[in-house]
């Protein structure tokens, strides 16, 4: 994947200014980050500009629209140092509105999925072939399964097996037995589906899933919808007890 790399560590709490200065100085070739970093740049620096009436009008003209998007793409790339070949996002779900915009300007990003117990990467795909809303395909030497009768259409827990998967928690056989089954598969606790091309999409966490009268409700999908509404800074969906529906 990479070799002969130089890793730069920030010596202070990574405020937006400190991060921006570091990118400008280091000019990284590869960036691995959480969604919050790219979302802040797009939402605070880009969206306010392109949502102005005159910009919306200009972006309805094909030739001008292409030039505007290319200009925005370059400015966002420059904000990350200007040299990187790919920006890999992980650790949480990428905001759908931001992702759609990144795709529209052909920004070189991709989304990966993993966990500490797995070394940590389980899925990844090059940004040029990455499928929107997914988190890529299983990486080499890793076997992934969706614990579902129909992995393409019915959500199930993501199970992982491979040389990068831990053998167990240190001196804690009870905790190990709870997550690694008899076949050697690690139960991630994450829910997802897999399309016909092997791309995985995370839908939520088992512990977060709300069961209402037998119906499975995934908070993340509702949160994504509410998050786009004006005036909402943050949102969290939680189930409440119900005698009629159970939760």
Question: How should each PLM-predicted stretch be described?
Answer:
Residues 5-26, 217-222:
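ATP-dependent adenylate-forming carboxylate-activation enzymes
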Residues 10, 89-90, 146-148, 155, ...:
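Thr-Gly-centered strand-to-loop micro-motif
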Residues 12, 35, 113:
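Short secondary-structure boundary segments
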Residues 29-32, 42-131, 143:
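Gly/Ser/Thr-rich phosphate-binding loop
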Residues 67-69, 73, 165-189, 206-207, ...:
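Conserved ANL (AMP-binding/adenylate-forming) active-site segment centered on the GW(Y/F)…HTG consensus within
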Residues 91, 114, 136, 190, ...:
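Active-site glycine-centered loops adjacent to acidic/histidine catalytic or metal-binding residues
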Residues 107, 137-140, 150-179, 215-217:
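Conserved ATP/PPi-binding loop(s) of AMP-dependent carboxylate-activating enzymes
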Residues 162, 167-168, 191-247:
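AMP-binding/adenylate-forming catalytic core of the ANL superfamily
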